[in-house]
């Protein structure tokens, strides 16, 4: 009787894991959905629409999973990890096909974009998956006797990691390279217990350690200089964007300029800056009208103010601390990767990427807590409802159709289409 009860509990646990996996995979896989030709490439309305729909799938699956698995340990962090590794493998394979000309990219200027419309966010997504693969591979490598399931996971993590390492250099995203390097070194350092080794070495070989730190610092400066010169115009453009963003923050540091107010605030600040005449020739050459700050921290401060940015950073820090205490090393590595990438790119402006980051933070916090999972389910339900209700996909489709009619000279039909909007 006891054995039968245990078997029933195991069956329910496995069923709950499968259902949860379906829900997580449904919402996170939106990032690999191909944007239809009826709206412009890079428009986020289609992705938001499907995030709203898949949020319903995730909520239903998660609640059903909780009903099936009331007493057993939650597998949410592990499920998020392996779903992301699988999606990383799909994206990396997609990129390899584009490199060899077997698949078309989503941008006329770049051969490599994956399912994204630009190689920058695509590379950042792969950089986020890299520490997850590294952690799982190192973790499974330490086991001398692996089951066939663990053996499959071992080769899957290794294969995806190697694919990512093959594709990342071709993306030419310095931000993604730094994100992958920092998060990868952190994950490997945790596994190799570098903190303990450095503490002991610092006590025994103090002078040698100081010399090593100085040399390491010089090497980092040289690497930074090389990366800067690799695409100097792009780097100078971002420096100007950050400078103008800081000026925009100074105009309204407490409450910001409102949601989606970055473009207008940036435009005004840049106009005033150039009107003063205190600009360099390089800044004049690289100035433009960006949609994003290419620094998520500055973007949040511009739109919502410095206090809100401080609260966001506190929430992220709490989630990261919980992840460390729960020993979710790979997931914490993914969080580090996104945080580093966000210093010089715009991952949170892509809804699917942002949703993935929310799941990483949730996987850090949830651990064994069903209450935390319920709270996260509620958050995703509200976010999904917002995406679905306030979606502009139909309007974007009609606008794009009218624009095409205008371009071919069908002005009356285009006029009628624009009037509907």
Residue ranges with predicted function:
Residues 3-16, 139-143, 148, 154, ...:
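A juxtamembrane structural motif centered on a specific transmembrane helix
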Residues 42, 234, 328, 348-353:
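Membrane-water interface of transmembrane alpha-helices in multipass transporters/channels
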Residues 165-180, 184-251, 259, 268, ...:
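A membrane-periplasm/extracellular boundary helix in multi-pass inner-membrane enzymes
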Residues 42-52, 204-207:
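Interfacial loop-to-helix junctions that mark the boundaries of transmembrane helices
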Residues 11-14, 18-37, 51-68, 76-108, ...:
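Alpha-helical transmembrane segments of multi-pass inner-membrane proteins
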Residues 106-109, 259-302:
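Interfacial juxtamembrane loops and adjacent helix segments
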Residues 241-251, 390-421:
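Membrane-interface segments at or immediately adjacent to transmembrane helices
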